[in-house]
Amino acid sequence: MKLSRFLLGLAAGATALTGIAAQTPVSGGVLKFAVSAEPPNYDCHAQTSFAFIHPVRPHYNTLLKFDTAKYPAIKGDLAESWNVAKDGLTYTFKLRKGVKFHDGSTFSSQDIKATYDRLRAPPAGVRSVRQASYADVASIETPDPLTVVFKLKKQNASMLTNFASPWDCVYSAAKLKQDPKFPERNIMGTGPFTFVQHVAGSQWTGRKFEGYFEKGKPYLNGYVAIFISGAPMVNALAAGEVLAEFRGHSPADRDRLVKTLGDKAVVQETPWVCSLVVTFNTRKKPFDDQRVRKALSLAIDRWAGAQALQKIALVRHVGGLLRPGYDLAASAKELAQYPGWSKNINASRAEAKKLLADAGQSNLSFTFTNRNVAMPYVPVGVFLIDQWRQIGVNVKHEQLETRLYLAAQQRDNPTFDAALDFNCDFMDEPNLQLQKYLSHDRSAINYAQQTDRVLDDLFDKQSGELDKKKRYAILREFEKRALDQAYPVPTIWWHRLIVHHKSMKGWHITPSHYVGQDLADVWLDR
């Protein structure tokens, strides 16, 4: 029987999957799955890509995690229970007893403190992409080995969900004391699988951790993440050489796999907390001129692009800074008022040409840096270049493999002109999605390099606002300024399509390709 899953009510966490009877998990077997890119290093705290989280996440635990069957509900991971004070300023966690690291050492509250100290105030030379998420933490206390207390400077609307971030791998305090950069080159966590090997350009292997704290888990004896992409990856899925690819497929690949696999295929799909954004290097002329950036955003027909691209790529939805359909996102009526979101593309492009002329850039040409990942970077990149051509702009398309692509944007003094960046998160939350638009000195994922204290102040206001209506109003102020200044600008939001073999059980799709990848609950029905 062919199975389908549609998670359309994200805010309500709709997770109904009809026609599937409950089954008892069976232990054993090795799961082989595909990953279409390779991690640049091994440090969770510095990474943002699926290429890292899919092979590496099974080695680690986090303080809390999402219950994928009830997403976006949260449950304990290393935390057994927790309490939030009435004033919202103190978070107390009781930790699991008897948890071991893979080297046999005992886990304690000191490891949580060391991990979050590294996240919120990284030592020199250590990169913490999510430092801004923990800027409101004033102190971390460890009254005993199984209790950790976070004290906040002010209320934060997203703090509890921050603690469920799949990126906040818990590291050994002892290892971090010896070398703060230990996680960049070494894998050593408390997760369901121990590290076996990473063969560059080939595969990543994990083995069942016999000392895992959850009795009976993981069910798998191990896993192999095979680095393969494009047509070879789809062929491997069709042939059963791999059972899954956890990021997402194009509609065409989905249709081909369903046709080939027949009743062996399971299809799961959902809107995606992920978008591609065009980032302009504001330290480089002419992209230091707001008129040029705004003109290039105005030239993009997002509405027509979404209709055309959804047939060939894993993008579908038109939205602003927040995922369309999310209750804090702009309405369609509000969107249409923003520059670049009008449905009158002829008027928008006329304005774009005038802005370029006023800036002395009527004959603008530049290099557009992109990632050589077919879905959806290449088709969206080609689409954007065609859009800019229609206002007389000449663009060279530079496509780089993941490591070089990330390095081109993340270096201290980037030399790129403009780049197709991604803004993906583990859940709908402005405190996460808006970090890319903060000033460069406040956000490690701002590659546009701008400083904008107006946006910084608006971010802080919405972050601490617990009244949803008031927060919504502040978010519209933020969005209006961000899209008018056009440091980075969103293009089209993604739609996640997963096809996997029905023999793989226990995996639930969520609106984030970062969530649910520890593989502790996955089992094989052979």
Where are these regions (language model features)?
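N-terminal lobe/hinge region of extracytoplasmic solute-binding protein
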Residues: 34-86, 117, 186-190
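Ligand-site clamp/hinge motif
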Residues: 210-256, 385, 394
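Alpha-helical secondary-structure segments
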Residues: 32, 108-115, 145-151, 191-192, ...
